[in-house]
Amino acid sequence: MTDNTPLTLAAITGAHGVRGDVRLKLLGEGLEALKAHSSFNEGTLTLKSVRSDNKGGAIARFAEVQGREQAEKLRGTTLTVPREALPPLEEGEYYFADLIGLDAVTDAGKRVGKVIDVHNYGATDIVEIAKDPVPEKGMKTFMVPMTTHAVVEWNGERIVIATDFAHPD
């Protein structure tokens, strides 16, 4: 994908302590990618420090945040950087944000849903897909590993899943 859409590296989930630190949910690229940047959201937030919370997230301090009350107001804020600030992708690589929102179809051409999230539990990335159509009892999802056996191809418009990995109704 070659658009200019900023990429989200983390989301603020709440305050941590009384000095204005915030808890972060790391998205896709992890703590090291976050540490590589000092400015987020077009310069509105300046990172002073960041460390692991030892639970898969992080604790960060921003120069503009002076106390718990200000930190709480940032809950739900995503931390974005310009796409050009990240390293170029090699063949077969992707940013999580590039997959989210893609239509999901089987290799037989049947539309099965839309990518709503990407997870990584250590072994490989896992794509979470919301089924089409949304059932009366609420959204149903299924997960597919981002392996060559499960995901046949992807581009800026869709992700193609091997039929064996597309969960039937």
From Swiss-Prot:
Major place of residence: cytoplasm
GO biological process, one term: ribosomal small subunit biogenesis
Any one GO CC term of the record: ribosome
A Pfam cross-reference name: PRC
Keywords from the UniProt entry: Chaperone, Cytoplasm, Ribosome biogenesis, rRNA processing
Keyword Cytoplasm in annotation: yes
Subcellular location: Cytoplasm
Keyword Metal-binding included in the entry's annotation: no
Occurrences of domain PRC barrel (ranges): 91-167
A single GO molecular function term of this UniProt record: ribosome binding
Function: An accessory protein needed during the final step in the assembly of 30S ribosomal subunit, possibly for assembly of the head region. Essential for efficient processing of 16S rRNA. May be needed both before and after RbfA during the maturation of 16S rRNA. It has affinity for free ribosomal 30S subunits but not for 70S ribosomes.
Family: Belongs to the RimM family.
Subunit field text: Binds ribosomal protein uS19.
Domain notes: The PRC barrel domain binds ribosomal protein uS19.
Database matches in NCBIfam families: 16S_RimM
Name the record gives this protein: Ribosome maturation factor RimM
Organism placement in taxonomy: Bacteria, Pseudomonadati, Pseudomonadota, Alphaproteobacteria, Sphingomonadales
Gene that encodes the chain: rimM
